[in-house]
């Protein structure tokens, strides 16, 4: 597929939108301008409807969404996005900048929900095969910092309303997975904004230049 799929990950309030802007600015400075943006869940008509179902606390009334149903909806949205948007773009040499991908499911559902990690890995491999982002920027914040920022933005979705314990488990799984995969780079997002932006620029620049070497 080529090395041009970059994903930004992190807890709520980690600063993914700002990070995306920095990534775009950095790529443009490196002469890369042909890019598209995606978000998960979402990014297609079907995936956006699934996003509403899984995140909008009012979407199914009083019905409780089970953990496994939640996982399957995330994967349904992801597969639709990957097959109809991301892969075709990559095949044409377009850079794809994604707000979340499969690492979110491994962290939120595997860590936060406590769903069996072997089952999640098996499901991922079955529906995505060996498709992975070329570079993932994981913005690491504590739940206390991240949720304070998220709550300042206004209404929280169904997952953003989870407990601190849920987000602590999610963060722990993020860190565990990041330590295992060299394609995942951890950025300390508790730093002042200028320092976070500097780290993102340096990471992306070094990575792009390394791909071209």
Curated annotation (Swiss-Prot):
CDD domains: TMPK. GO terms for cellular component: cytosol. ATP binds at residues 10-17. It catalyses: dTMP + ATP = dTDP + ADP. GO terms for molecular function: ATP binding; dTMP kinase activity. InterPro entries: P-loop_NTPase, Thymidylate_kin-like_dom, Thymidylate_kin_CS, Thymidylate_kinase. The keyword ATP-binding applies. Its EC number is 2.7.4.9. It is an enzyme of class 2 (transferase). GO terms for biological process: dTDP biosynthetic process; dTTP biosynthetic process; dUDP biosynthetic process. Phosphorylation of dTMP to form dTDP in both de novo and salvage pathways of dTTP synthesis. HAMAP family: Thymidylate_kinase. Belongs to the thymidylate kinase family. This is Thymidylate kinase. It comes from Salmonella arizonae (strain ATCC BAA-731 / CDC346-86 / RSK2980).
């Amino acid at each position: 597929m080529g090395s041009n799929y970059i994903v930004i990950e992190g807890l709520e309030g980690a600063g993914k939108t700002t990070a995306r802007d920095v990534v775009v600015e950095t790529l443009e400075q490196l002469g890369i301008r042909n890019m598209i943006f995606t978000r998960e869940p979402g990014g297609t008509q079907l995936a956006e409807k699934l996003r509403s179902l899984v995140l909008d606390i009012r979407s199914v009334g009083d019905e409780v969404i089970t953990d496994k149903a939640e996982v399957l909806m995330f994967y349904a949205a992801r597969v639709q996005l990957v097959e109809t948007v991301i892969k075709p773009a990559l095949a044409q040499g377009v850079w794809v900048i994604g707000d979340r991908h499969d690492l979110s499911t491994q962290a939120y559902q595997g860590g936060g929900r406590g769903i069996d990690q072997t089952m999640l890995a098996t499901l991922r491999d079955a529906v995505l095969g060996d498709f992975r982002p070329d570079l993932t920027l994981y913005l690491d914040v504590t739940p206390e910092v991240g949720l304070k920022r998220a709550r300042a933005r206004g209404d929280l979705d169904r997952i953003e309303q989870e407990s601190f314990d849920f987000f602590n488990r999610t963060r722990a799984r993020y860190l565990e997975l990041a330590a295992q995969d060299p394609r995942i780079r951890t950025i300390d997002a508790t730093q002042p904004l200028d320092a976070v932006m500097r780290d993102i620029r340096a990471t992306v620049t070094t990575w792009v230049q390394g791909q071209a070497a």
